[in-house]
Regions:
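Acidic, Ser/Pro/Thr-rich low-complexity regulatory regions
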Residues: 1-156
Length: 156
């Protein structure tokens, strides 16, 4: 649920009620119990507008428990942690992960951001794809090493 609310605040996600309803059901199954979650958990897939309203209620109900970041930078770092964990767990394509972390979540005006190396990796990967026929295992391993290093260090 925390990730769903972080994504929602980042880009108005989820666009469909499906993700919100699934997250509510998972939270309820995990023992979280709020009136907003119960309402959200019984919505049909087509009730997108209602899901957005209920997500706002759930966010208010769970705010003290979830400790959501209050700044854009804090939110982006939290989302980067999720994204990098997904990469390391094999749930996210290396190029998609590098693009999300290096461009969407890395601040453009911070040359010292711990997320900036992902942008550099993506440039090299795109160059390799264009001239070398695809990503090599070594380059993907380098990205995974970088993700593990950043998760253990600046994003820990």
């Amino acid at each position: 649920m925390r990730r769903l609310l972080l994504e929602r605040r980042a880009v108005g996600w989820p666009e469909s009620a499906v993700a919100a309803v699934e997250a509510a059901r998972a939270a309820l199954a995990g023992g979280v119990d709020t009136p907003g979650l119960w309402e959200l958990g019984v919505l049909s897939d087509g009730e997108v507008l209602e899901s957005h309203r209920l997500l706002a209620e759930v966010e208010q109900e769970l705010w003290p428990v979830l400790r959501l970041p209050t700044t854009v930078e804090g939110r982006d770092r939290a989302l980067a942690r999720y994204c990098l964990r997904d990469l390391l767990d094999g749930r996210l394509d290396p190029l998609a992960a590098a693009e999300r972390v290096g461009f969407e979540l890395c601040p453009y005006d911070d040359p010292d951001s711990p997320l900036r190396p992902f942008r550099a990796w993506l440039y090299r990967a795109e160059d390799q794809q264009e001239h070398g026929g695809g990503l090599t295992e070594e380059l993907v391993a380098e990205l995974r090493d970088l993700a593990a290093e950043v998760l253990a260090g600046p994003l820990s």
